[in-house]
């Protein structure tokens, strides 16, 4: 409240009822101004909530409101399709030894004079033009009948029947068909009913819903040991990209965690989103660098061992820049620094900068970010202040990429690994039992890890099922030599 426009001597000369009247209205004005400030803050919060979209929050694009701004790239001015100088793609002709059937077409008459054409003439004929058509064969299941022929024992005076070989067991389905069921479910995200229909329509095999579930559970058992081995290897990883998303077991809330490492991609379904679930995934002895967002469970790992995802921070600063308070300039400044950071990183990825040069160019960005966060921590906007103070606490985790080779500015690897699982969840609504949860973990881990290493999925799963049926252990998912993460 500003001071009165007159001095105490004037105040003392006023009639007694006038100062009393002024004091009443001054108090009313103070209360009104306080209420206005409170309502303005409330309006800003509601507007920020109304304006939330995938560009300024963690909200997925599928939940964006109609008025959300479209993230459109600037037009390049080029025509769509192949550009001048682009080397086109075409199908290479298969070698003759791989051709199943050859059909020769001969011209019989000349299109100009209608004369009969001669074949095998002495003249040099032009080169034979070849055109190949690729087709799928009609699939018929191979049905193998195993007959158990009893023999008579003259000593015991009884018939003796043989046992089925261990690799056959009592299953009505072979390892390859079983592997198809597991892969159609876990890799191609088909529901149990869709798998039944696909096998019937494409392969001519009738399988019941109950058999589909039994085959998935048996495959899960076959993959149990390699899955556990890959999961235990996370603790020895030098870098791990970790994220989590919601999952369901019947009507119960569950969480699907993922850890992408140099050697493998591990999935784990847990009952919580807390620290205990994180330690179950990465192990208590984890000493590498953890890529993550700012979810509280990750604080169990020291900041010097973390790299916060700058894609998440970019959305946070975008939200601050849209606030009609003192947070706006803080958010705009943060966006400028993030743009500089990504520009430097992209130049490093393109080979224009060495790692040492990238570190050097990040020094001024790091200094400006520190200044920004210190100013934002006392800017007068509670939202911006809380965010900046939180980032100051996590300061060692903001630019770990400048001190550790192999560290990236975003957690995109983990988020990309979860996308297929999210689509599967939306199509199948989660799992209905604990066995289903274990199958989800193991088949997702197996498929993602094999794709990461460019290994054949079907061949591995078939071999794992064959080993399981004979009481053996499937081969390891981990490579014999360290592999770098396959570029997505």
Q: Locations of the language-model features?
A:
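Short, flexible loop/hinge motifs at secondary-structure junctions
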Residues: 1-169, 242, 248, 292
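Catalytic center-proximal scaffold of phosphoryl-transfer enzymes
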Residues: 30, 38, 91, 107, ...
């Amino acid at each position: 409240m500003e001071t009165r426009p007159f001095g105490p001597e004037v105040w003392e000369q006023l009639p007694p009822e006038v100062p009393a009247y002024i004091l009443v209205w001054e108090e009313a004005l103070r209360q009104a101004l306080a209420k206005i400030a409170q309502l303005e803050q409330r309006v800003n919060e509601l507007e920020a909530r109304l304006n939330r979209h995938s560009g300024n929050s963690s909200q997925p694009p599928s939940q964006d409101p109609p008025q959300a701004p479209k993230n459109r790239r600037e037009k390049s001015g080029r025509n769509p399709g192949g550009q001048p100088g682009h080397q086109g793609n075409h199908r290479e002709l298969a070698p003759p030894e791989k051709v199943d059937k050859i059909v020769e077409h001969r011209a019989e008459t000349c299109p100009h004079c209608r004369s009969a054409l001669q074949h095998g003439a002495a003249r040099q004929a032009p080169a034979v033009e070849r055109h190949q058509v690729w087709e799928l064969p009609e699939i018929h299941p191979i049905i193998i009948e195993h007959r158990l022929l009893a023999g008579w024992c003259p000593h015991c005076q009884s018939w003796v029947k043989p046992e089925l070989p261990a690799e056959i067991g009592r299953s009505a389905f072979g390892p390859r068909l079983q592997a198809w069921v597991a892969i159609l479910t876990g890799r191609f995200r088909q529901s149990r009913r869709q798998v039944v229909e696909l096998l019937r329509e494409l392969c001519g095999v009738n399988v019941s819903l109950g058999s589909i579930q039994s085959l998935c559970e048996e495959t899960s058992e076959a993959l149990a040991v390699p899955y556990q081995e890959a999961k235990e290897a996370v603790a020895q990883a030098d870098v791990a990209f970790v994220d989590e998303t919601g999952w369901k077991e019947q009507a119960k809330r569950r969480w699907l965690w993922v850890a992408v490492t140099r050697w493998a991609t591990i999935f784990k379904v847990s009952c919580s989103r807390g620290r205990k679930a994180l330690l179950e995934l990465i192990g208590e002895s984890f000493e590498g660098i953890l890529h993550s967002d700012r979810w509280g469970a990750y604080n169990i790992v020291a900041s010097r061992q973390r790299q916060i995802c700058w894609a998440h921070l970019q959305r946070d600063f975008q939200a601050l820049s849209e606030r009609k308070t003192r947070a706006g300039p803080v958010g705009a400044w943060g966006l400028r620094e993030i743009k500089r950071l990504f520009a430097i990183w992209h130049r490093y990825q393109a080979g224009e900068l060495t790692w040492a040069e990238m570190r050097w160019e990040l020094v001024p960005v790091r200094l400006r970010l520190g200044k920004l966060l210190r100013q934002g921590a006392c800017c007068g906007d509670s939202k911006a202040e809380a965010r900046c103070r939180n980032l100051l606490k996590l300061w060692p985790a903001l630019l770990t990429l400048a001190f550790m080779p192999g560290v990236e500015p975003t957690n995109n690897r983990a988020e990309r690994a979860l996308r297929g699982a999210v689509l599967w969840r939306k199509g199948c609504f989660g799992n209905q039992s604990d066995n289903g949860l274990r199958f989800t973990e193991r088949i997702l881990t197996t498929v993602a890890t094999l794709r990461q290493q460019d290994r054949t999925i079907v061949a591995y799963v078939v071999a794992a099922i064959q080993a399981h049926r004979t009481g053996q252990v499937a081969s390891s998912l981990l490579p014999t030599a360290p592999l770098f993460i396959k570029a997505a």
